[in-house]
């Protein structure tokens, strides 16, 4: 704890003579050389002996009383003897010897307490962090004293003023203590500098205009947490960028320095549907090969086109009590030679062998190859009609015949007994009258084992089960209804065939 030199030393010694001797010994000993050392916090080492508290002084004095006589040295006697003035005569010599003995005992006790307190102060000083203002103030005072006298003179009043801060305040100093209302004792110069900067009462002080706090808000970013009124609006700015609506068929220009290759010439023509008499025409989106245009829709090559035979529409309002049929989904698949033909077509288009044909694929799928060859195509200046027909045939073969679209097949729909069979030997319905018994006996080419317009088997007189034109018969006896028969045979009635064969 760094206390005041006057009060602490008076409590320890109660003698003004010894205080004068101690200050004089410090000046003569050259202890003030450590004043400019930043590692010692700008305090002299000789004053660490007086920097202990009362408890340490009592302990040091009690321990030093036992070894007072043994610790006295000749150098101390000579040192303290030299500090006092000399007296003449024998009486003066006795007084000098008595004073030296008393002062040497006090000097030895202070030196012993100094050795014990320096170790304690070194441990405590490691936790001390001097403020920057106090350090800079002491440096300025030291430099100003050196410039005036050429050395570092220290007076008692100035030294007392520089050691006002206690050791407890140095050990516990932080930002909160420095920023408190209590002024720091070593910040006199800083306070003076601040006073110089503040204007006088008579000076005119210009009031700076107060800038209001502004905030830029996007209308789309407002939420329920914001509360604004009309009077809060200062100005309305247009948006930085407004996206314009752009159609899907718009074209994007490509600069001349772009690496995009030129696309071949596109052909626009009409295909007349002979069945319906309708005309289909698609607008060409590329003008010529001289313009650097690219198609945005060409990014999707494998586009699924609608089927030529739409599925029959069912009335969803009629609820059926029957079970829904089990259907099998056939995924979209490609032919094994699809990629080969696709690579050939792409290579020919890049080399301008085949032109880019703009045609409705839905209508092209309905045409046959012979109809494509017989099309009347308007002559183009850069492309021949044969190249256009070859491009149409290649496109139809690639995207219509080699691509199997996704569809739902009824489970077992492709089995023979679920197909639609028709009679080939009888095309006319028989008379509604009773059939003669000799009809089956005569060898008639139009006869059949199954009655064409009846569901009764001819050789079963006691059954009314229908015999289908195509099916399977169980040859073995079924012992368990849950198990499948051991032997089955498929049959087709004579004179009946699949409707696809006609």
Curated annotation (Swiss-Prot):
Note in the entry: Present with 1055 molecules/cell in log phase SD medium.
The entry's keywords: Cytoplasm, Nucleus
Gene Ontology BP terms: intracellular signal transduction
Species for this entry: Saccharomyces cerevisiae (strain ATCC 204508 / S288c) (Baker's yeast)
GO cellular component: cytoplasm; nucleus
Compartments where located: Cytoplasm; Nucleus
Protein name: Protein GIS3
């Amino acid at each position: 704890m760094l206390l005041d030199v006057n009060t602490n030393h008076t409590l320890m010694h109660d003698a003004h003579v010894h205080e004068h001797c101690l200050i004089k010994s410090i000046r003569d000993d050259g202890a003030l050389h450590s004043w400019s050392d930043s590692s010692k916090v700008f305090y002299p080492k000789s004053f660490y002996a007086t920097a202990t508290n009362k408890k340490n002084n009592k302990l040091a004095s009690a321990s030093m009383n036992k070894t007072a006589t043994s610790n006295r040295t000749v150098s101390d006697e000579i040192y303290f003897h030299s500090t006092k003035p000399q007296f003449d005569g024998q009486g003066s010599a006795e007084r000098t010897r008595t004073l030296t003995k008393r002062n040497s005992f006090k000097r030895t006790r202070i030196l012993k307490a100094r050795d014990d307190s320096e170790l304690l102060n070194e441990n405590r000083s490691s936790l001390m962090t001097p403020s920057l203002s106090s350090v800079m103030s002491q440096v300025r005072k030291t430099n100003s004293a050196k410039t005036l006298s050429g050395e570092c003179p220290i007076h008692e009043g100035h030294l007392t003023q520089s050691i006002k801060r206690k050791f407890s305040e140095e050990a516990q100093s932080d930002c909160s203590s420095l920023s408190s209302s209590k002024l720091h004792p070593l910040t006199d110069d800083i306070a003076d500098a601040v006073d110089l900067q503040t204007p006088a009462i008579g000076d005119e002080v210009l009031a700076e205009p107060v800038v209001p706090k502004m905030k830029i808000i996007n209308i789309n970013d407002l939420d329920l947490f914001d509360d604004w009124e009309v009077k809060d609006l200062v100005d309305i700015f247009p948006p930085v960028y407004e996206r314009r609506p752009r159609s899907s068929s718009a074209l994007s220009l490509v600069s001349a320095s772009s690496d995009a290759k030129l696309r071949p010439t596109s052909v626009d023509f009409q295909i007349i549907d002979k069945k319906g008499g309708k005309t289909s025409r698609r607008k060409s989106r590329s003008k010529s090969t001289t313009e650097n245009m690219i198609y945005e829709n060409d990014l999707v090559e494998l586009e699924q086109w609608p089927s030529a035979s739409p599925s029959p529409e069912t009335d969803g309002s009629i609820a059926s009590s029957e079970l829904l049929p089990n259907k099998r989904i056939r995924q979209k698949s490609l032919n094994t030679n699809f990629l080969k033909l696709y690579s050939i077509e792409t290579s020919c288009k890049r080399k301008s062998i085949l032109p880019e044909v703009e045609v409705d694929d839905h209508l092209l799928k309905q045409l046959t190859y012979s109809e494509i060859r017989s099309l009347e195509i308007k002559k183009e200046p850069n492309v021949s009609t044969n190249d256009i027909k070859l491009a149409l045939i290649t496109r139809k073969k690639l995207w219509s015949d080699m691509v199997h679209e996704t569809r739902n097949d009824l489970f077992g729909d492709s089995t023979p007994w679920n197909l639609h069979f028709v009679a080939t030997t009888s095309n006319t319905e028989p008379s509604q009258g009773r059939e003669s018994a000799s009809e089956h006996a005569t060898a008639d080419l139009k006869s059949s084992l199954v009655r064409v317009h009846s569901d009764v088997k001819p050789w079963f007189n006691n059954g009314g089960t229908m015999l289908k034109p195509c099916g399977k018969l169980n040859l073995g006896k079924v012992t368990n209804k849950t198990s499948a028969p051991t032997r089955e045979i498929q049959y087709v009635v004579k004179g009946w065939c699949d409707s696809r064969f006609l």
